[in-house]
Amino acid sequence: MKLLIIFCYLVINLYTLFPVYASRSSDSYDGNIFPIYAGNGSIVPPQTTLRDSINNKRISILFFYLDDNSDSKALAPAISGLDLIWRNSIDIIALTTDELQNRKQEDPNEEKFYWNGLIPQTLVLDGEGNVKYDKNGTIDIDQINKIISEIKGIDYEESSFSIESFNEYNSIISKRDDTKNK
């Protein structure tokens, strides 16, 4: 009985003395960044491979990231926003660079061929596998939307979307209201 009381005391103290925190601005590992910071766990693991995407003539977005990188955490809502806008029209292939360490780099149908060794890195490839956008760090979602529209041959309309935080961890893409600034 005495042992049970001591055990309960230790368990209660462990939970109160060492709370768990997640922080978008730190380089700590908090778990997978898409469900935690973008509210979209369906992006990982990728639903397709680059090879399949090119074979099916689909536009691909490659996103190379690490779960314990603050810049990658900050971009997760933007990648999730692109998924929301273009879900049925493009393939989003988000890969942690840990997965790429022992892969060969010679094949242009493989994801690692396009990774430049820095994170986060975002690329847009047309249906033929030609790189139309390649950037490390912060991305311009409007520029990516314009590129995707051009590849698809549809008119590009200036974006009326923005990515806004709805709590301290998650963000959502929402319609931009420019009337507030007038």
Give residue ranges: language-model regions.
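Bacterial N-terminal signal peptides
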Residues: I5-Y15
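N-terminal "domain-start" segment that seeds a small globular fold
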Residues: V20-T49
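N-terminal post-signal-peptidase region of extra-cytosolic proteins
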Residues: P45-T49, Y65, A76, E106-E110
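Soluble non-cytosolic domains of exported or imported proteins
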Residues: V44, N69-K73, I119, T138-D142
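Thiol-/selenol-based redox modules, centered on thioredoxin-like
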Residues: G137-K182
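Thioredoxin-like thiol-disulfide oxidoreductase module
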Residues: S80, D91-K132, I141, I148-K152
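Typically the conserved alpha-helix immediately C-terminal to a functionally engaged Cys/Sec
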Residues: T48-L50, D71-W86
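Short active-site neighborhood of thiol/selenol oxidoreductases, capturing the structured segment around
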Residues: S53-D68
